[in-house]
Amino acid sequence: MRKRTEPVTLEHERCAASGSSSSGSAAAALDADCSLKQNLRLAGKGTAEPHSASDAGMKRALGRRKSLWFRLRKILLCVLGFYIAIPFLVKLCPGIQAKLIFLNFVRVPYFIDLKKPQDQGLNHTCNYYLQPEDDVTIGVWHTIPSVWWKNAQGKDQMWYEDALASNHPIILYLHGNAGTRGGDHRVELYKVLSSLGYHVVTFDYRGWGDSVGTPSERGMTYDALHVFDWIKARSGDNPVYIWGHSLGTGVATNLVRRLCERETPPDALILESPFTNIREEAKSHPFSVIYRYFPGFDWFFLDPITSSGIKFANDENMKHISCPLLILHAEDDPVVPFHLGRKLYNIAAPSRSFRDFKVQFIPFHSDLGYRHKYIYKSPELPRILREFLGKSEPERQH
């Protein structure tokens, strides 16, 4: 009996030992599996975090790009809308074109006292005010020949007016748009002409500088006519020449045409940087570049000019002018293209109205850099004027 129970007991003990060993192994395996899964989760979480951060950064960058593109597109649409709107605005408000042509609101240089030409280095110049019409007053400068500058000190307006009767020729200078009679390049030209023995009379059209009135082609021409008659009433038989620059050439040919029609022509007409007519000049002007090929350019931009009564038809006026004509033009003129000055000469030269008078065209090479308003710098200018107009009276005291 005892022998049979021992094996059973031993068997049970082995089974128990085996069972406890199996359960321990299973528990260890289970713990290992859990640990492995936890490690895998941690590893997965660690690798996922950089990916999610990278994705967020890319999203932010894309967002910024979209926002920038949206703003850029908005700006482009605004510019395009503005570009398209301007022609319609000009067509509906022709006065805008008149403002851009006259530019009388641009006063350069600023802060100068036009009552004091001596502040601009013109110490032999007198400031006048004339009244062409009831509600119009224009400021005038009269610069005498430079050899009289000492005698001119402290003299009044009457002395200057009497000086016009001296035996020296007179140039009536008609300036272009923008600025005043005190513009830098204009003052330098007065000095050159004065040094050559000429009286120089210039003025600001109504609406320019300190002159009172509203600008218009008719008004500008009438102002010039009034000043011319004022000069002739005081100058006796002295030669009177008319010099127009840029837009002033339009005023000059309007004036001379009227003078010729009433049979009181000037002794000569000088046109510096002239154009043919205001339509061709406006089409060739640098400001028109961005619209020059715009559909309906003439209808939108040029027709409003003529509908405002602005023509400045130099080409048409040439057919009615009978006096010597000198045209000066720089090849590198960026404002009034050289070819317009040449074209005007080609219209005038064969005209019957000039058949008994000298017509001359003087080009200035682009290498000289005289552009639109610096022809006065040319050392050849005194010779050109002397040969065309004749030698001015020898210098003498007044």
Swiss-Prot record:
<dbReference type="GO" id="GO:0032839">
    <property type="term" value="C:dendrite cytoplasm"/>
</dbReference>
<comment type="function">
    <text>Lysophosphatidylserine (LPS) lipase that mediates the hydrolysis of lysophosphatidylserine, a class of signaling lipids that regulates immunological and neurological processes. Represents a major lysophosphatidylserine lipase in the brain, thereby playing a key role in the central nervous system. Also able to hydrolyze oxidized phosphatidylserine; oxidized phosphatidylserine is produced in response to severe inflammatory stress and constitutes a proapoptotic 'eat me' signal.</text>
</comment>
<dbReference type="GO" id="GO:0016020">
    <property type="term" value="C:membrane"/>
</dbReference>
<keyword id="KW-0812">Transmembrane</keyword>
<keyword id="KW-1133">Transmembrane helix</keyword>
<dbReference type="GO" id="GO:0005737">
    <property type="term" value="C:cytoplasm"/>
</dbReference>
<dbReference type="GO" id="GO:0009395">
    <property type="term" value="P:phospholipid catabolic process"/>
</dbReference>
<dbReference type="GO" id="GO:0008474">
    <property type="term" value="F:palmitoyl-(protein) hydrolase activity"/>
</dbReference>
<dbReference type="GO" id="GO:0046475">
    <property type="term" value="P:glycerophospholipid catabolic process"/>
</dbReference>
<feature type="region of interest" description="Disordered">
    <location>
        <begin position="1"/>
        <end position="24"/>
    </location>
</feature>
<dbReference type="GO" id="GO:0032281">
    <property type="term" value="C:AMPA glutamate receptor complex"/>
</dbReference>
<protein>
    <recommendedName>
        <fullName>Lysophosphatidylserine lipase ABHD12</fullName>
        <ecNumber>3.1.-.-</ecNumber>
        <ecNumber>3.1.1.23</ecNumber>
    </recommendedName>
</protein>
<keyword id="KW-0325">Glycoprotein</keyword>
<dbReference type="InterPro" id="IPR000073">
    <property type="entry name" value="AB_hydrolase_1"/>
</dbReference>
<dbReference type="Pfam" id="PF00561">
    <property type="entry name" value="Abhydrolase_1"/>
</dbReference>
<dbReference type="GO" id="GO:0046464">
    <property type="term" value="P:acylglycerol catabolic process"/>
</dbReference>
<dbReference type="GO" id="GO:0006660">
    <property type="term" value="P:phosphatidylserine catabolic process"/>
</dbReference>
<dbReference type="GO" id="GO:0004622">
    <property type="term" value="F:lysophospholipase activity"/>
</dbReference>
<comment type="similarity">
    <text>Belongs to the serine esterase family.</text>
</comment>
<feature type="compositionally biased region" description="Basic and acidic residues">
    <location>
        <begin position="1"/>
        <end position="15"/>
    </location>
</feature>
<dbReference type="GO" id="GO:0050727">
    <property type="term" value="P:regulation of inflammatory response"/>
</dbReference>
<feature type="active site" description="Charge relay system">
    <location>
        <position position="333"/>
    </location>
</feature>
<feature type="transmembrane region" description="Helical">
    <location>
        <begin position="75"/>
        <end position="95"/>
    </location>
</feature>
<dbReference type="GO" id="GO:0052651">
    <property type="term" value="P:monoacylglycerol catabolic process"/>
</dbReference>
<feature type="active site" description="Nucleophile">
    <location>
        <position position="246"/>
    </location>
</feature>
<keyword id="KW-0256">Endoplasmic reticulum</keyword>
<dbReference type="GO" id="GO:0005789">
    <property type="term" value="C:endoplasmic reticulum membrane"/>
</dbReference>
<feature type="glycosylation site" description="N-linked (GlcNAc...) asparagine">
    <location>
        <position position="123"/>
    </location>
</feature>
<dbReference type="InterPro" id="IPR029058">
    <property type="entry name" value="AB_hydrolase_fold"/>
</dbReference>
<dbReference type="GO" id="GO:0004620">
    <property type="term" value="F:phospholipase activity"/>
</dbReference>
<keyword id="KW-0472">Membrane</keyword>
<dbReference type="GO" id="GO:0010996">
    <property type="term" value="P:response to auditory stimulus"/>
</dbReference>
<feature type="topological domain" description="Extracellular">
    <location>
        <begin position="96"/>
        <end position="398"/>
    </location>
</feature>
<feature type="topological domain" description="Cytoplasmic">
    <location>
        <begin position="1"/>
        <end position="74"/>
    </location>
</feature>
<feature type="active site" description="Charge relay system">
    <location>
        <position position="372"/>
    </location>
</feature>
<dbReference type="GO" id="GO:0007628">
    <property type="term" value="P:adult walking behavior"/>
</dbReference>
<keyword id="KW-0443">Lipid metabolism</keyword>
<keyword id="KW-0378">Hydrolase</keyword>
<dbReference type="GO" id="GO:0047372">
    <property type="term" value="F:monoacylglycerol lipase activity"/>
</dbReference>
